[in-house]
Amino acid sequence: MAQPKRRWSKQRTHKHRANWKLEIPNLTECPQCHEMKLPHRVCPNCGYYRNRKVVNQD
């Protein structure tokens, strides 16, 4: 595999990493309890997924 001829400077590294951004998670509203949740996952608040009780919340 090819190897770099010279080491990247700190400035070049920081400029390169300046474009690394975190993405905001996509949230949807739970149809049962109307809390925000991640899509395609069980609601952590009420335990429902696709209108079925999947997890018992005690």
Curated annotation (Swiss-Prot):
Keywords, A to Z?
Ribonucleoprotein, Ribosomal protein
Signal peptide (UniProt feature, chain positions): none
**A Gene Ontology MF term for this entry?**
structural constituent of ribosome
**Top-level taxon in the UniProt lineage:** Bacteria
Please provide, in alphabetical order, the Gene Ontology terms of the cellular component aspect for this entry.
Answer: large ribosomal subunit
Which Pfam families does the record match to this protein?
Ribosomal_L32p
Q: Which GO terms describe its biological process?
A: translation
Entry's InterPro entries?
A: Ribosomal_bL32, Ribosomal_bL32_bact, Ribosomal_zn-bd
| Record-linked PANTHER family | 50S RIBOSOMAL PROTEIN L32, LARGE RIBOSOMAL SUBUNIT PROTEIN BL32
NCBIfam families the record matches: rpmF_bact (TIGR01031)
Q: What is this protein called?
A: Large ribosomal subunit protein bL32
Lineage, uppermost ranks: Bacteria, Bacillati, Bacillota, Bacillota incertae sedis, Caldicellulosiruptorales
